[in-house]
């Protein structure tokens, strides 16, 4: 007689005890975006993620699909991150100048009005002018400090040729890379994926109309299943995607 727990195991929430055992013994793997996001995040966030991956040392594995997608997109992500950094600096500088200019104009208008008032002493007006002018300079200095933080040694300095993040990824996953599919195997998987996509069966059916990497999520899922079965171990997949498929 069939067991409900065995038949519908995928639909039954696991207990806290089972979760604890999984975290203690399972293999950790990541999707492509987790690796690429290391170039997009603030350096401190990147360090924390890499430290978290390192804490699983001896229990990590990287699928061939993710490694392929990572190296295909790495250079573009690095260059895009650099462009975003420059754009951020320019926005801060522009906003600072705009605020300083607006305050100075308002201050000049105020002082002109006070100067025409004979009941107010020139000394008081000069003191007010010097004090308020100092505040506008403080705004400019604050902007400079923010930009220095953008461009300081704390900011991840990465180029396609000089890449400490890549070195760390290799150090963590180097000897734990999964196998690729053979040509015939991949052709058969594409046939299966097409049928699944027609019936909105995850993973990956939302990518059906993509021109590039249409079956990437499905290939990753298949490689994880094969690895878990081969090693007879649970696998934890860390992903930053939030798509329904």
Regions inferred by a protein language model and the residue ranges of each:
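Charged catalytic cores and adjacent phosphate/nucleic-acid-binding surfaces used
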Residues: 240
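Active-site-proximal, substrate-binding regions of enzyme catalytic domains
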Residues: 4-235, 243-245
């Amino acid at each position: 007689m069939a067991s409900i727990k065995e038949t519908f195991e995928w639909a039954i929430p696991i207990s806290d005890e089972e979760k604890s055992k999984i975290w203690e013994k399972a293999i950790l793997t990541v999707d492509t975006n987790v690796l690429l996001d290391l170039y997009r995040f603030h350096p401190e966030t990147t360090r924390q993620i890499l430290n978290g991956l390192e804490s699983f040392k001896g229990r990590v594995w990287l699928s061939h699909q993710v490694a392929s997608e990572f190296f295909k997109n790495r250079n573009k992500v690095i260059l895009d991150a650099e462009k975003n950094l420059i754009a951020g600096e320019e926005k801060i500088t522009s906003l600072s100048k705009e605020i300083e200019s607006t305050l100075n104009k308002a201050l000049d208008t105020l002082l002109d009005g006070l100067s025409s008032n004979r009941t107010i002493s020139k000394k008081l007006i000069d003191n007010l002018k010097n004090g308020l002018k100092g505040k506008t300079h403080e705004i400019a200095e604050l902007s400079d400090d923010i930009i220095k933080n953008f461009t300081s040694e704390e900011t991840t300095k990465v180029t396609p040729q000089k890449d400490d993040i890549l070195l760390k990824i290799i150090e963590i996953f180097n000897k734990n890379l999964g196998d690729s599919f053979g040509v015939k195997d991949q052709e058969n998987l594409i046939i299966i994926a097409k049928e699944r996509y027609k019936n909105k069966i995850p993973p990956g059916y939302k990518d059906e109309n993509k021109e590039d990497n249409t079956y990437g999520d499905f290939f990753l899922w298949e490689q994880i299943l094969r690895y878990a079965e081969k090693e007879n171990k649970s696998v934890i997949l860390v992903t930053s995607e939030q798509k329904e498929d």
